[in-house]
């Protein structure tokens, strides 16, 4: 008996002694498989789902827009992506174990129909391969089983072959355009494999033994080596067997490519995944679109969806997924990849559906449940399904205690528990309970101070609290700890945009979207930067009807058009105001055209404009206004002009114009509270000097996922040096009022939302010589966030007020547009 005889006893009956003598090759293949499988968990970093970008960004945009009202600036949030400490993996980054079927002992090496082909190594982009098994029978190359689970009986589980149009498979799809990178990768590596296959000795010369060895290599985790060896004698294999080996090799490259994307930052990170995409698309062209091949083609497309999503070709991935969903069964891991693509493309309803179906259909170990649940959580928030998101969190919490159950060592922490606590804190922040959510994040940051996911979540909370400076400082500090974490890098860029530091944001974003096209945080930064750098159109229009104190009928349209920024600090703008009023049987029009230059830098904005008025008192003039935001809490602004648009129409009719100077100081505690003080003085050409002082205080008193209620208190006083004029000019007056503001957002979809607001105002007005009288006003407003670039708001209202002792009922409406072009 030779030393190799015991080995031959464990071989299948059909193996010859010649094939049995090659056990050194088997040992080498097994060793290589163990090395690959063992090192994958060490190099694979986790990633949160990029759908959180949209969820946080929507709330940050609305808060900063209301608070800052700075015109062209656009604000956005960040989220965590691959590369951080303790960061959960993207739902597509599955850690799976693939098994395949082996040809029967009497399999012929002659060409035969594809329907009789054996199943090859799992084409699913898994990161592990199953241990060698003595020819298990698997219903398809994409069946996923956890280690040690026996393969099911194919005779008992094989589904009936579909008939009709569904049997045609995805082959009826129009071919996707192969990217130049993928074509080049396929040409460069057509005869090779990446990573290179280690030499393991000569192959058998016997035809049957050679055939069996290649199929065993394909089955036991060496599919690319099997493909390489098959090319030596392609005529020794059935055409269908070649297809299955090619499929298994392409799937293995997808697995390698997905790992390469995580650990390499240079342009070479796409080499393997591009090769895999090219091979998958070439294989689809080889396999005939026939009913007997429909199931196999469905499996190929399932892996193609994963590869395309990993490469950042999200639209192509969605196109393939939607087509294959109509023709047959879709694996759970493919639905996860499709969910990632939908989330990336800001279609959260479809992302939620894909994630939910993946969780429902997945076999044990097929997908990373926690990551998919996190993606579903953010997709629910992005579609306004807050109650369902809360229920999902409760389920996750029930399934994941703080410590691992039945762990070898008592008290072993459960890594998914910290994820759930972070999501609970983010849920509080994104549904209005910002302080409570931030307190929870600060608590967990104390427990894990270097976790990039917690740093990004906390910085997001600062943005929601209208604290962009603090958010940027957090990201800047985190960069020293996580210089390669894209969520931190992109977050720093977006926070820089929030304080008008365009140069820094551009430097951060430079080249990121080309190097990481699949990354959601990088894409969010690019979208914010594109909006910030685009031209912008802002239109504010009003019309009202009242008594004759100011005008019987009046309307005005104020239009500003800004160019895109140039030299990182400048914009050109054009300004037009057109208005008309009717009173006492007469009418008066006013038009003013101007052009100017805006200069901005971190926390500073200055606008200088030269303008020309036409009409009865037309003149050439200029306006200078400036805003300084030295911190997250203080904002100081001022304006000076020698052609004041606030001069009443009745005064303008008789040739009166005015010069004015005004200033405002505002202190903001957070998104729920602020106070402001305004002073203005105007000198009219009829020698009337008008002064005004106003103070306001706002406090939010109630918040829920869809509703907020706040109260705005105001008091002001004014005085004029001249009275008895043809326009309203009281010697002294005072007013105090309180406005209740109810805001309701019944619809939300990614960047889009609809908000309805009701304003109810009541107060007292006192005019010297005329006494005190009540004043009331009611207003209804709708705000449409049409997309990331466009906001439309409009409203109607009614007010009652006394002027010179005479009551005036005023009806008004308005329309505002903010459209980056």
Outline where the language-model segments fall.
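Gram-negative bacterial Sec-dependent N-terminal signal peptides
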Residues: 1-47
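Compositionally biased, proline/threonine/alanine/serine-rich low-complexity intrinsically disordered stretches
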Residues: 47-203
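Gram-negative and organellar
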Residues: 135, 161-164, 172-821
